[in-house]
């Protein structure tokens, strides 16, 4: 009861303060607190369909959903070339002001391409300071497949961001992990190793994505030795929507019994989750994608560093 009350008081304080962000004052001994909505969304690669899930129909639902959720930063998967061409502009028309960083595991240079994933962030709020990518294989620095994942080339990307108003920095990694059980289990240590390598300052850390695994598998168990699984961490009264994240184009009718394969992990002494949501919205009976978007609200608190004399 005490833990739930603490979360409620934090949330009440945020509502009372509007944005929940303290004013950043250089050389102040008070810490700066930032509220961020972090999430993940598998967009579902377009295919030949003539129903309500056809791309030319559902792309408008997808854009509306993204804009209305109001992510601060989120990871996307199955960000195929057709989606790359259409979705950013549609989201902007709906009022979403985002920068779209793209990594295709099918591009040996790691840039844009088919079957991509990416990091989407509010371009007026954040600056991307650095980015990295790698492949989920025994040779992660070169374009490659790994273990029993024969059909798809899998990878991950990450970045360090700075919030412009406060100077607070954080690390975000995103992946679309293998379906093969052996590949999934072996990819997890690669991801964890790179998360540590690319975040040497131990900044607040987030890891999101369609991880194609369940919470009791070796991959999930390993991730929880480093990060916290937001779904499992927050009290039940601030966990909204369904347990399952994979709606399978509406075929999974009971979403609480559906697979939870999309995740939001976090790490850091100054990182506190306020709530978690799996957004199950439909439009005229159709989901925007075959996965539901997930998001979590966080308070990130770090002491400010003086910039005087720089």
Q: Where is each model-derived feature located?
A:
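His/acidic metal-ligating clusters that form di-metal
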Residues: 153-175, 183-221
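Structured beta-strand-rich core segments of catalytic domains in phosphoester-bond hydrolases
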Residues: 77-169, 277-278
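Active-site-proximal beta-strand elements of phosphoester/diester hydrolases
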Residues: 35-48, 130-134, 168-178
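Active-site neighborhood of phospho(di)ester-bond hydrolases with catalytic His/Asp-centered motifs
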Residues: 75-77, 103-104, 206-210, 229-233
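Catalytic metal-binding/acid-base residues of hydrolase active sites
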Residues: 44, 80, 176-178, 211-214, ...
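Bacterial N-terminal signal peptides
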Residues: 6-14
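N-terminal, active-site-proximal structural segment of metallo-dependent hydrolase catalytic domains
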Residues: 15-92, 105-114, 299-310
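Metal-dependent phosphoester-hydrolase catalytic domains
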Residues: 22-27, 182, 193-205, 213-310
């Amino acid at each position: 009861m005490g833990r739930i009350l603490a979360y409620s008081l934090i949330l009440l304080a945020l509502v009372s303060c509007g944005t929940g962000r303290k004013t950043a004052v250089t050389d102040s001994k008070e810490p700066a607190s930032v509220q961020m909505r972090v999430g993940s969304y598998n967009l579902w690669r377009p295919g030949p369909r003539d129903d309500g899930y056809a791309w030319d129909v559902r792309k408008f639902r997808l854009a509306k959903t993204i804009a209305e959720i109001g992510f601060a930063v989120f990871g996307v998967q199955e960000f195929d070339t057709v989606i790359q061409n259409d979705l950013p502009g549609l989201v902007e028309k709906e009022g979403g002001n985002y920068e779209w960083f793209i990594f295709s595991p099918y591009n040996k240079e790691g840039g844009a391409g088919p079957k991509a994933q990416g990091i989407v962030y509010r371009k007026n709020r954040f600056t991307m300071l650095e980015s990295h990518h790698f492949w989920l294989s025994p040779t992660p620095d070169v374009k490659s497949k790994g273990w029993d994942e024969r059909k798809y080339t899998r990878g991950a990307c990450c970045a360090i961001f700075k919030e412009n108003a406060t100077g607070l920095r954080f690390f975000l990694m995103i992946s679309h992990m293998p379906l093969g059980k052996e590949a999934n289990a072996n990819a997890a240590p690669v991801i964890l190793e790179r998360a540590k390598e690319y975040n040497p300052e131990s900044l607040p850390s987030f890891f999101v994505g369609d991880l194609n695994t369940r919470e009791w598998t070796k991959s999930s168990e390993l991730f929880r030795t480093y990060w916290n699984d937001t779904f499992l961490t927050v009290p039940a009264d601030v966990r909204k929507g369904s347990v399952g994240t994979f709606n399978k184009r509406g075929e999974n009718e009971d979403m609480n019994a559906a697979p939870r394969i999309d995740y939001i992990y976090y790490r850091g002494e100054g990182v506190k989750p306020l709530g978690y949501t799996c957004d199950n919205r439909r439009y005229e009976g159709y989901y925007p994608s075959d996965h539901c978007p997930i998001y979590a609200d966080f308070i990130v608190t770090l002491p400010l560093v003086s910039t005087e004399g720089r």
